[in-house]
Amino acid sequence: MALLASLLILPVAGAHAAGSLGVAKWEAGTCTGNETQVKSCEYTSPHSAFYTQAAGHPPWGLTGFELTTSGAAPTGSPLKRLRVDVPPGLAADPQALAVCAPSQFEANTCPADTKAGFVQLKAYVEIPLAAQALTLEGNVYNLPQEAGHPLMFGIDVKGIPPLVKDVHLVLEGHVSYAHEDVLAARGVPSGDFHEWFEINNIPTTVAVEALGIPLTDAPLKTIESKLFFNGHAGKEGKENFLTMPSNCKAPSTSYLELETYPPVEKASQPTTPPVSVDGCENPNLPFKPTATIAPETSQYDSPDGITTDVHVPQFEKSNQLNTADIADAHVTLPEGLTLNPSAVNGLQACTQSQLHKGSAAPVECPAASKIGTVNIETDLPPRSLSGNVYLGQEDGTAAIEGLPHPFLIFIDAESVYDVSVRLEGQAFPNAATGQLEVSFLGNPQLPFSDLTLTLNGGPRAPLANPLSCGAASTSFAFSAYTGASFGGATPFTVSGCPETTPFALSQATTNSAPNAGAYTDYTFNLERGDGNQYLGKVSTVLPAGLVGEIPKVTLCGAAQAQAGSCTAASQIGTATAYVGAGSEPYPFSGPVFLTGPYQGAPYGLSIPIHAAAGPFDLGNVVTHATIGVDPHSGRVIVTTTDLPSIFKGVPLRLRKVTVTVHRSGNFLFNPTNCGPLATNTTLTSTAGATQSLASPFAVANCNALPFKPNFSAATSASTDPKTLKANGAALRVNLLQNAHEANIHSVVAELPKSLPSRLTTLQKACPEATYAASPSSCPEGSKVGSATVTTPVLPQPLKGPAYLVSHGGAAFPDLDLLLEGDNGVRVILESNTDIKGGITKSTFASIPDVPVSSFVLELPSGPNSALTAVGALCTQTLTMPTTITAQSGTVVKVATPIAVSGCTGKGKGKTRIKILSKKIKNNKLVLRVQTFAAGRVSVKNRNLKTTFKKFAKAGKFTIKVPLSRKGVKGQRAHKLSFKARVGFLPKSKAESVSVAFTNVGFKHKAKKKGKKKR
């Protein structure tokens, strides 16, 4: 790439002339015609004399100026330096010509195919005794490019034999890629990639000789100078030495700067031709660039080193119009070829200040910000522009935040010829799909045939291939400086996919404490290999008995949970997500917070993971989960339905998830069942595939856990036959258990014959289908009681009704307890009912492995009572054989006494104590009694000394009551006959005070008389 416009000026005089340096005329433009016609091309020429077609190859490019004169000689000091800056887009292509070697140039033997143009000038030569204005001509040749100079031309000004010898000048050309303060000071644009040309250290004399003998070095001054570049010069098939700008809206202004030897004077002047570039709307003006993407590997769902090539066809013949320069470029990558989070490993960013775009300062981007390489195929010369691609960061920003802001891509292509192309691109990912659109806007008018950008490959590649195989496409849209646009698509193929994309993940779990019932930390791991379908939903059922004490945690509020801004008081663990394709996914971690109700579940999780790594800070990715409870097994179910697969346009390609539940002060505790357990998970992919996983879970030393449940029961029933028939009997069952014992697995209880099931109520049982659909729709008569369960894992007790539920094929309906608690936690305890010989047996065979502080079952009397009574309960000894089995396997069997309430007051049938036997011996009444609860027994009568006896538990006891004086006297007289009052005061206020009476009388005297008669 190089630009036309070089002004030639011949060496000027060594003697100082009167007056100041001045430019009388300065013109630059592109002209038509042949070599003879172009010599007369000036601003005053008809417009038809100028070539104006945008992106065309002009026949000629010329620059010319005249200096002010005083008499026949120019004014001012001799020129030391001159510079010409031409319009952006006006390009000279040195590759169109052969190269004249420096030795050939010095010997005036440059080949004809190296000629780039000619010069024409008028000079004042101070030949001794014959100073005069001479008309001189010469040729311009293409010289080899040198380091720091992409354009080099030699100007051979022919002398006038035999007096004036030839003059050789070197015209150095360059590209203005950086801002230059000195140009800005005189109003000349810089950094816009226009070409400029300069002659330095202009000689001040020319050799004069006669008959081949050197006579002197004569000063000479240029009066007029014109340089003509042959725009159609070039080797066969490449006759495009000059190319016009593509912008019809920008002025075609060129700038001239002159500088003299001391005393230094400078002159600067712009010039704009009378006609501007036009023809941008020419339908024959070609503009069909393309973009193709080639993968380093075509393996699906893997990191890939992508090579993107933007190809711009060049039309190099003189009778052709060249491709217009690209102003804006948009390339949309194939769907599925997206950003790869693994790239963040060790990645840094290059700031705009470090790129130094528009500056000649060296690029200072960190090595760790390099994400690829770039090559630009231009004419300065081919394959000379190459460099690096960097991840960019906007100045003044603390981090790269992602959408709605684009990701920045910096390109730095350098050449040994001191040309630097520094571009800032933008990558916009689609927020929903991650599809990338890469844009480079306001590109320089720099002719190129190919721009090849290759991103790094390997496990940390910035891009990763699609998960699915098949043909995809790269779409592109380019706009030219002419205003034209062109778009299209090129194919992109991904291969290596199996017939069906697999969905086979692995799961593992660990717990920190092995002992049953111990507080523990629990870690859940889920891993997905490359090539598997992406994870969309996770539903995990924890091992039975692995539960946490929710009252210990402050639940996070809904607003804070949604925002991921919960406090530490709500944290119960940590989570780590490994994201990105390849062998080096990047881990991002964050806290796990316990929340209140979420999406209809009683509890939830808020898991904010801060997506900050390296130069990136995309903010929090907040994942939510529901926490439910299986109503039958009590197992905790954690379900994530909104598992993110993309965030701010970056597909996560989730590889591994690790969640650890741990909390200072203890939260989670182990099951108390040492049998084989498991964590069961159901996975659903984003494509709808499912997978079931199970990982074993076990605890030990269950036998070391104590198991001492306290079971009690009480009943009541009316003694009035009519009332009893109408309302039946009531039953209350209580169970108490200390903390840190083995949890209950099953309970089997048998009611005595005196408390049979009530047939009329059994017949009102709720049908199984109705109960399953909606218990509230069950017949009123099927609701026979209520239950309350207090557990340390919930802040509030579980409460709910007790239903009789009939099952098809079962002989008797079951008793089901429908318990609900905090935030809608529901637990269903099901018992199996069997009735034989009037004895009702209820079996709760599978109670959840959850600690229970207390359990109360109330089966009240009433029209729909579950039980009725046979006989006067207060006069009977009622027991309930009970078998309680622990989760650890320990079995407790007890004959649970059933206390009878409502037996206090006067009259018969008022006892919670039963008299088993009585006798008088040694002046004492010996009573054998049975109590049905702990309490105090009192025995009173005037014939007895009042006696009190305490018993710590229910049972059968012997009480010896001394006779009073009256009693002893009556015994001696054989006239002892009285009714003893036996009272019972229970220890528990829940029990009833009872009284029993027994008649005491003796007939010893009669018996003795009978024996004597015999």
Predicted segments — roles?
Residues 1-17:
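Sec-dependent, cleavable N-terminal signal peptides
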Residues 3, 82, 329, 538, ...:
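Residue-level detector of buried hydrophobic side-chain packing
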Residues 16-908, 1000, 1007, 1011-1014:
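Ser/Thr/Pro/Gly-rich, low-complexity intrinsically disordered stalk/linker tracts of secreted
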Residues 532, 741, 930-936:
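Short proline/glycine-enriched turn/loop motifs at strand-loop junctions of beta-rich domains
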Residues 566, 949-957:
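Short proline/glycine- and polar residue-rich coil/turn motifs
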Residues 913-916:
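Surface-exposed, proline-enriched loop/turn segments that connect beta strands in immunoglobulin-like
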Residues 983-1002:
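C-terminal tail/sorting-segment detector
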